[in-house]
C-alpha cells in the first residue's frame, strides 16, 4: 500500500460568512487576519435573528450628546455580552478584543471597538428601571419562543453563589458556601432564563421569590 504524500497540498475549502461593508469574511486555514474567537460570528448571526441585543439596547438610556457618540449603545452591549459568552469576563480583556476582526464583524462594525473604560461607563448607566426593562425583554423573548400556548409551565427558582474576590459593595460571608459572595436568584423555565436578580448573601435564599413569582405569573397570564 503506498504511503501518503505528507507534503501534498490539500484543499480544505472555506466557509463564507455575510459581508460587512467591503470586508470579506471567510473561514479558512490560510487567511490573513486571524482570530481565536471565530465562533462569535455564529453567535452574532443567531442574535441578529432573535433581535435580543437590539431589544436590550433600547432599554438603556444614553446620556451622551448624539454629536459626540463614537460607539453606540447596541455595539457596546454586543461587544460586552459576546465577550462574556466567549469567556472574556474582565473589561480589561477588551483591550485586545476591541481589535479582533471576528468580534468586530459579529458586532457589525469595521473599526476598533469601545475601550474598557467606555464599556465601564456603559455598565454604570444601568439603574433599577433599566434592570426592569431588561427583564421584560427576557420574558418577551420567552413568550415569543412558543408558537402555541403551553399546557404547563414549570418555573425553577434557584439561589446560587457568585464568589467575590475584592471589596465589592454588598459583600458578605456565607457559611454554607464558605466564601464571600453574592446570592443571586435565578428563575428558569426549562433552559430559558426569565429572571436574574442580584442580592447580597446575608439573606434567606427564598427572599423575593414570592414577589417575583407573582409578577411572572401575572405577565404570563396576560399572554395566555
What does each model-identified segment do?
Residues 1-179, 183-204, 208-223:
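Dynamic "connector" segments at or just before major functional cores
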